[in-house]
Amino acid sequence: MTVVAISQSNYLPWKGYFQLIANADVFVFYDVADFTKRDWRSRNKIIGPGGFQWMTIPVGSNRGKSIQEVQLPEGQWRSNHLETVRRNYAKAPHIEDVLDIISPVYNDLSINTLSDFNQSLIRRF
């Protein structure tokens, strides 16, 4: 029997998301679904010395658009998010390895949709 898993792409997903992918024979990103503001597609929480902190990609409401249609904004959010990860996990084991994995996606300005950005991050792991 073939195991198929289908999910919307998430921004910096939790461990269980990767377990879902690993346990499936076929994984499908379902990014034709409607984008919903203030959801895991464009934000996530990280924990640092000061407690939980939201990291949100400022994409706006994008009412009526699918996840794959949401355009990434210009601005400093990419470098700010990388710096937030670096600062909050500076003393964590393997932080440099993690930054080596995710930095190319954050630095690639040709990735201009939320769906492509999230999928690129997920595929790097």
Ranges and model annotations:
Residues 1-124:
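Residues lining hydrophobic/aromatic ligand-binding pockets adjacent to catalytic sites
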